[in-house]
Regions:
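NTP-dependent small-molecule kinase module
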Residues: 70-139
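Phosphate-binding/switch loop-helix module in NTP-utilizing enzymes
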Residues: 14
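A glycine- and Lys/Arg-enriched "phosphate-lid" helix/loop adjacent to the NTP-binding pocket
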Residues: 1-10, 18-70, 116-124, 133
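A general structural signal for short secondary-structure junctions and capping/turn motifs
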Residues: 17-20, 78-80
Length: 139
C-alpha cells in the first residue's frame, strides 16, 4: 500500500520533469474487453501455435477483472494530466488499434515533411482524457 501511494505521488513529478526537459511523453493504455480477453485466453489454450503466449497471469486477470478495472480507473484519475495525458486504445481489433496509435503519434509530433492526412485517428479507438470518460472504457 505504501509503495502504491508513493508511486502515485512520484509519477506526476517525474512526468513533469521529463516534459519540462523537452521529452514528448505519450502514455497509452491498451484496453481489451472482457469478452475479447476470454476469447484470446481460450485461443491460447487450444491453438498449439499460440500456446507460447500463455501465462499464469491470464487466468488471474480474468478472475480479478473488476479489481484491475477499478485500479486502472483510479490510476487514470491520479495520473492523467494536461502535460502528460493518457490515451486509451481499444484493442479488440489489433490491426485497427496499431494503425490508430501510429496515426495518433504522427499527428502529435512536429514533423513538417509528414503528410498528416494519411494518419487519421478514430476517436472510438483512441480515447483521450480517460479520467473524464470512464463510462466509455471497457468494464
Amino acid at each position: 500500500d505504501h509503495e502504491y501511494l508513493e508511486f502515485m505521488r512520484q509519477t506526476p513529478q517525474l512526468e513533469r520533469m521529463l516534459v519540462n526537459s523537452g521529452i514528448k511523453l505519450f502514455k497509452y493504455w491498451f484496453s481489451v474487453s472482457r469478452e475479447e480477453q476470454f476469447r484470446r485466453f481460450k485461443s491460447r489454450q487450444n491453438d498449439p501455435l499460440k500456446q507460447w503466449k500463455k501465462s499464469p497471469i491470464d487466468a488471474v486477470a480474468l478472475q480479478k477483472w473488476d479489481e484491475y478495472t477499478n485500479a486502472r480507473d483510479e490510476m487514470f484519475l491520479k495520473t492523467d494530466f494536461e502535460h502528460a495525458p493518457w490515451y486509451v486504445v481499444r484493442t479488440d481489433d489489433k490491426r485497427a488499434a496499431r494503425l490508430n496509435v501510429l496515426g495518433h503519434i504522427i499527428r502529435s509530433i512536429d514533423c513538417p515533411e509528414t503528410d498528416k492526412t494519411v494518419a487519421a485517428v478514430d476517436p472510438a479507438v483512441v480515447i483521450d482524457n480517460p479520467g473524464q470518460r470512464l463510462d466509455r472504457l471497457a468494464r
